[in-house]
Amino acid sequence: MYIFFPKLNPIIFTIGPVSARWYGFMYVISFLFAMWYGKKCSIKNKKIWYEKKIETLLYSIFLGSCIGGRIGYIIFYNFSYYSQNMLSVFYIWEGGMSFHGGLIGAIIVMSYFSFKYKKKILEISDFITPLIPFGLGAGRIGNFINSELWGRVSPNFSYAMIFPNSQNQDLKEIKKYPELQLLLDQYGALPRHPTQLYEFFLEGILLFFIIYFFSKKDRPTGSISGLFLIFYGLFRIFIEFFREPDPQIGLLKNIITMGQILSLPMIIAGLIIMYKSYYKK
């Protein structure tokens, strides 16, 4: 017995030609949470520089991660399409964001603040890191409401979900596995892993508490950032085994996804940062 995707409207309300969507709303509440939690952390840790500059820092990182996320998606996932459809780069309502691109954008912004205010970049990233998982989780809820980024076909998994808008991809699966035709006829779509919810739990909830409890004690500079890179990379690589690869890319060499390739350097960088934080004098 499979689970049917609930009837969720991705649009909150519409006024004239303008529609407010849940996905965009998730970005808003993520930023508001980051602003609130960031100020709370700055007061608790008595980081005077952060108290004075936190709003500018967070606004800049939010903007940098959004721009980086868009550019990252274009370069990493669909460069051939956007190189021939340049105006589509600005059609952000059509979707297309990359966490890894957003991370690069955030790092560029933090590097600027590090240079301007004579702070170590890892001091800044250690402050920012606990604010990230909430946004990751909220974003995946937005993906779920949009019924996008669903997982791979899993007919033997009892809690697989039927996503009605996966039919185009399902037809490609039928060509490879004709035995799935009966399931398609019966349910209207093939059962898939609800990987948005997996990511919500691992990258949103679990990662938040890992970073939260780790950062409650005084830690060496860089260790919080390193821990985040390691666990996000591990969680993302794990989930990619269940997530449907982007159709325009598929499995690279029929083995690995682009998300896994981009996450592996995060783990390596996290391990190096952790080692230097604790052992390099």
From Swiss-Prot:
Transmembrane segments: 11-31, 57-77, 89-109, 194-214, 222-242, 255-275
Major place of residence: membrane
Keyword Ribosomal protein assigned: no
GO MF terms, alphabetically ordered: phosphatidylglycerol-prolipoprotein diacylglyceryl transferase activity
GO cellular component: plasma membrane
Membrane topology, from the record: Multi-pass membrane protein
Pathway this chain belongs to: Protein modification; lipoprotein biosynthesis (diacylglyceryl transfer)
Pfam families found in the cross-reference section: LGT (PF01790)
GO process annotations (BP): lipoprotein biosynthetic process
Statement: the UniProt record of this protein carries the keyword Disulfide bond: no
Domain of life assignment: Bacteria
Positions annotated to bind a 1,2-diacyl-sn-glycero-3-phospho-(1'-sn-glycerol): 140
Documented EC number(s): 2.5.1.145
Keywords per UniProt: Cell inner membrane, Cell membrane, Membrane, Transferase, Transmembrane, Transmembrane helix
Subcellular location: Cell inner membrane
Function: Catalyzes the transfer of the diacylglyceryl group from phosphatidylglycerol to the sulfhydryl group of the N-terminal cysteine of a prolipoprotein, the first step in the formation of mature lipoproteins.
Alphabetical list of PANTHER family matching this protein: PHOSPHATIDYLGLYCEROL--PROLIPOPROTEIN DIACYLGLYCERYL TRANSFERASE, PROLIPOPROTEIN DIACYLGLYCERYL TRANSFERASE
UniProt similarity note: Belongs to the Lgt family.
The protein, known as: Phosphatidylglycerol--prolipoprotein diacylglyceryl transferase
Organism: Buchnera aphidicola subsp. Acyrthosiphon pisum (strain APS)
This protein's encoding gene: lgt
